Amino acid sequence: MAKTILIPTDFTVESLNLAKTALENNSNTTEKLRIILVYGQWTSSSITELLFYSKGQILEVLENEEFKCSCKMLLAKYESIIDQMSIDIFSGTNQNAFENYLEGNKVTEAYIPRNYKLKLKNRNSFNLIPFFTKSKTQLFEVNWNTVSLENSENQKNEISSLFFTHGQIAH
């Protein structure tokens, strides 16, 4: 049976540092990993909007090319230990809903950033970190330095920097 790891995301390459850390921490295990990247967004209360609600369409709007490319790179680099990597939206309103989400997805551990504030994409988005910190799931806080980007060349380098370790390319 695969271990399931829950990781909050804001659909930036930077937020994938949590996934990279989780994968590195579990790289010596023979157990396969299920990675769930989750984003907090409330659903509308409009009957019309709920009738035509599509999680796929919402994710399509939230994801960008750099994020998709970085996810593919993570999958390729850690294919030997990743059983499945998915992106989901949590739209619950309280801690009980979050605990039910964890139980329903059989989440065994979670990773959150210590010194990085997730960026909310729209007015319906909300910060999931308080739900994580109050949960009963084993929680790992990841500390990393963020770098401000000044131009698009730096943004491209940010993707490749996910896979550099101490000045050398990680294999």
Model-flagged regions — what are they?
Residues 1-17, 129-171:
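Intrinsically disordered or low-complexity boundary/linker segments at protein termini
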Residues 25-27, 101, 131:
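Hydrophobic/aromatic ligand-binding patch that stacks against planar heteroaromatic rings
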Residues 29, 79-81, 133:
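Short, structurally constrained coil/turn elements
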